[in-house]
Each structure stands twice: as C-alpha cells, then as structure tokens.
Design a protein with these regions (language model features):
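Adenine nucleotide-associated cytosolic modules
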Residues: 1-125
Length: 125
C-alpha cells in the first residue's frame, strides 16, 4: 500500500471499492487542494462532502457571519452560532468531521485584488 495506512484507508472503503477510485484514486483525493468560495447555501454541503470524501486540503473563503435566516438551508451552522463568522465555524466543523483534512479558513471576500494569490495554491475552485 503506497502512502495511505490501512486504518485511514478503511474510512474510505466504500468509495475505494469503485473501479474508478481504488486506493490510487483515494491517494489522489488526499493530495487534492480545493478552494470553496462561500460557506453558505452551496458551500456548506459541498465542503462537508469534500471533507468526508477525504480531500486532503480545503480552503474556505467567506466574510459573512451566521444569521437566523441561514439556519434552514446552511447545515454547517446551529442556532447558538448566530453572529459568529461562518468560515471559522465551517473550518472547525470540517476538522471535527475528518481530522486528516487540512482546512484553511480565509475570513474575507474573494476579490480581483486577492484572487490570484488565494487561488494559486489550489487545484480547483
């Protein structure tokens, strides 16, 4: 087994059974770097699934705080977190879901001024 230990690989057993993934594919997922822009309605579930699938490096960009109006559709957040920064909470939740994932929060908006510097470290946005 090249790279991933049996214990860690066991977590992904269901997806590594797929001929398209196998162990080599899971190792590629572990090496992947994904930047999620926005941790709201779409970014919230997307980031959960990326962490659950074993994407090794996830960047999160968001400058917003949780509001009551978010709670019915943004599954990363809870009532007690209203007013807190989404990106900080999202990073914490993803790390709790999968401690093998490196999560980097960016508490800002993606703008023309910062996009190049932020995106350069990721394989996909």
């Amino acid at each position: 087994m090249s790279g991933m230990e049996d214990k860690k690989l066991g977590r992904y057993e269901r997806q590594t059974m797929l001929p398209e993934i196998r162990t080599g594919g899971q190792e590629r997922l572990r090496a992947a770097r994904v930047l999620v822009v926005g941790t709201g309605g779409l970014g919230s579930p997307v980031s959960l699934y990326l962490a659950g699938a074993g994407i090794g490096h996830i960047g999160l960009v968001d400058d917003d705080a949780v509001s009551t109006t978010n709670l019915h559709r943004q599954v990363l957040y809870a009532e007690a977190e209203v007013g807190l920064p989404k990106v900080v909470l999202a990073a914490r939740r993803l790390r709790a879901l999968n401690s093998d994932v490196d999560v980097k929060p960016f508490a800002c908006r993606l703008t023309p001024d910062n996009a190049a510097g932020m995106i350069q470290d990721y394989d996909i946005v």
